């Protein structure tokens, strides 16, 4: 039962962090999330699939924010 609770907390933490990535609106905010992730990943054990998912989400959000910055610059 304790293992199930730990698994639940683990999954909730991953889901919460993925939500923060999804709701991030600025490159500065994304850089803070990336720095936090790089620090935290060294302190905890992540499943390979979760690590890949988080890294993909960070990269995807970076591309999205950089593309939106390019569109704003072009409109001036």
Swiss-Prot record:
Q: Sorted alphabetically, which keywords does the UniProt record give?
A: Late protein
Task: Name the source's superkingdom.
Answer: Viruses
Q: Keyword DNA-binding on this protein?
A: no
The family database entries (InterPro entries) matched by this protein are listed as: UvsW.1-like_sf, UvsW.1_dom
- Which is a Pfam family this sequence falls into? UvsW-1
| Oligomeric and partner information | Probably interacts with UvsW.
Functional description taken from the UniProt entry: Inhibits the single-stranded annealing activity of UvsW, has no effect on UvsW helicase activity.
The protein in question is named Protein UvsW.1
Source species, please? Enterobacteria phage T4
The lineage is:
Viruses, Duplodnaviria, Heunggongvirae, Uroviricota, Caudoviricetes
């Amino acid at each position: 039962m304790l293992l199930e609770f730990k698994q639940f907390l683990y999954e909730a933490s991953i889901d919460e962090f993925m939500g923060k990535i999804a709701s991030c609106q600025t490159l500065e905010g994304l850089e803070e999330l990336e720095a936090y992730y790089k620090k935290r990943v060294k302190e905890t054990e992540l499943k390979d699939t979760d690590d890949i998912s988080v890294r993909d989400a960070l990269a995807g959000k970076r591309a999205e924010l950089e593309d939106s910055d390019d569109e704003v610059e072009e409109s001036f």
